[in-house]
Amino acid sequence: MSDWNPSLYLHFAAERSRPAVELLARVPLENIEYIADLGCGPGNSTALLHQRWPAARITGIDSSPAMIAEARSALPDCLFVEADIRNWQPEQALDLIFANASLQWLPDHYELFPHLVSLLSPLGVLAVQMPDNWLEPTHVLMREVAWEQNYPDRGREPLAGVHAYYDILSEAGCEVDIWRTTYYHQMPSHQAIIDWVTATGLRPWLQDLTESEQQHFLTRYHQMLEEQYPLQENGQILLAFPRLFIVARRTE
């Protein structure tokens, strides 16, 4: 896959950071020493962690060289490592693992989540936020356009679901706080929706297409978005964006 584009990702920085702020507010920890920010991106979530725990040793993990470079430039006091979340091993047990909009990209959560819990110190916390928009028009239409144009399905799998995550983490020895929130983002145009998803969910669909194929895909996608997302009275578009939140704390 081509590398992530930090500038495009940060075009909606306020909207992307808001769930991280709300997830962080539910983390029941005070004085802690070791934190990992999994899928740290350009460092916007890491900055929130550093602001709350300025004395902690924070390590940001991301597989994108471009994102890691951006994060290092923005936060020289934090450590950033280019690595796969599934394979990275901390040097010590972690008091907090923070994963904002990253774990949805990885498969087999039935193994991944217990593995992450095993990296925590006693009473440590795994805090996770994942987009839960597999059934939203933005993502359904990606699959429909690909089917129409005879391209393979490259979208991510749907999340396991609230009850499944509760059971996974309870069985891993955690107290679990889990909730789901739907945000309604004001978009000035249908093209703005495309700009949003091009930085994230649409990337796998476009990565192997030629420039002309990408344009053909996006033109059709734009047409279908217009059918699914009507304009409000003031000309804005409300983009529904559900997100799943989990705060799991080890009980020993």
Curated annotation (Swiss-Prot):
Q: Coiled-coil ranges per the record? A: none
Output the GO biological process annotations, alphabetical, semicolon-separated.
methylation
User: Major location, coarse class?
Assistant: cytoplasm
Disulfide bridge positions per record: none
Q: Which family does it belong to?
A: Belongs to the methyltransferase superfamily. Tam family.
Protein task: Catalyzes the S-adenosylmethionine monomethyl esterification of trans-aconitate.
Q: Which HAMAP family match?
A: Tran_acon_Me_trans
Query: What's the protein name?
Result: Trans-aconitate 2-methyltransferase
